[in-house]
Regions:
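Short hydrophobic alpha-helices and adjacent helix-cap/hinge residues
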Residues: 1-151
Length: 151
């Protein structure tokens, strides 16, 4: 999603992870959501798709399934919309931690005195209905690690 200002760091991290694990990464950029149908059609034969969370989860999940592409996103809403899985920081925990920071600041702690923290809780959500529709079997070792399994 070229207009998304986070696409460059997103792709950079994806490329780094791909090269470290020996996985070939191919980028497909779009300018508008109306380009998604053509973009997904061009992905025929790919092993999997990682969808930027700034795109419509309903549309991208539907296109992933229609083109029989296993798909993942950092949006927890993605599997609920029909995508295969999401793996990302827990937004609920980020909001909670933000509120705790704000509380400390309002009580007089200088923001510069607070430690910088990254997300602590990472969530894995798997949609087994989509896995079955794609002819995939999710190993039990993955299912037991999932925070939520949609059946």
């Amino acid at each position: 999603n070229a207009p998304d200002p986070f696409h460059k760091p997103f792709l950079g991290q994806l490329d780094t992870a791909g090269s470290q694990s020996g996985v070939d990464i191919e980028h497909v950029m779009i300018e508008r959501e109306s380009d998604l149908e053509q973009a997904f059609a061009s992905l025929a034969g790919m092993d999997a798709v990682i969808v930027q969370p700034s795109l419509s989860v309903k549309l991208t999940a539907g296109l992933s399934l229609a083109h029989r592409l296993p798909s993942a996103s950092a949006s927890r809403r993605f599997p609920a919309a029909g995508g295969l899985l999401s793996y990302a920081a827990s937004i609920q925990h980020i909001y909670r931690d933000s509120a705790l920071y704000l509380d400390r600041i309002l009580k007089g702690v200088r923001p510069g005195d607070l430690p910088v923290q990254g997300p602590v809780q990472i969530e894995l959500v798997i949609n087994l209905v989509t896995a079955k529709a794609l002819g995939l079997t999710v190993p039990q070792s993955i299912l037991i690690r999932a925070d939520e399994v949609l059946e």
